[in-house]
Swiss-Prot record:
Keywords: Chloroplast, Plastid, Ribonucleoprotein, Ribosomal protein. GO terms for biological process: translation. It is found in: Plastid, Chloroplast. InterPro entries: Ribosomal_bL32, Ribosomal_bL32_plant/cyanobact, Ribosomal_zn-bd. Its main location: plastid. This is Large ribosomal subunit protein bL32c. One of its GO terms (molecular function) is structural constituent of ribosome. Disulfide bonds: none annotated. One of its GO terms (cellular component) is chloroplast. Belongs to the bacterial ribosomal protein bL32 family. SUPFAM superfamilies: Zn-binding ribosomal proteins. It comes from Amborella trichopoda. Pfam families: Ribosomal_L32p.
Length: 57
């Protein structure tokens, strides 16, 4: 027969939520940093062909 489990304490709940949020924040910072390095051309892990626009007069 199913028995209800004990309630999780608030401190444990906050720890788990903060850890989950921190993981997302770190992933966002890493993605932003990679995007910034790719856009400036300083990336060492991605090879992006830079396109230059020339104006003809």
């Amino acid at each position: 027969m199913a028995v209800p489990k004990k309630r999780t304490s608030m401190s444990k709940k906050h720890i788990r939520r903060n850890y989950w949020k921190r993981k997302g924040y770190k992933a966002a910072v890493k993605a932003f940093s990679l995007g910034k390095s790719v856009s400036t051309g300083h990336s060492k892990s991605f090879f992006v062909q830079q396109t230059t626009t020339k104006t003809n007069k």
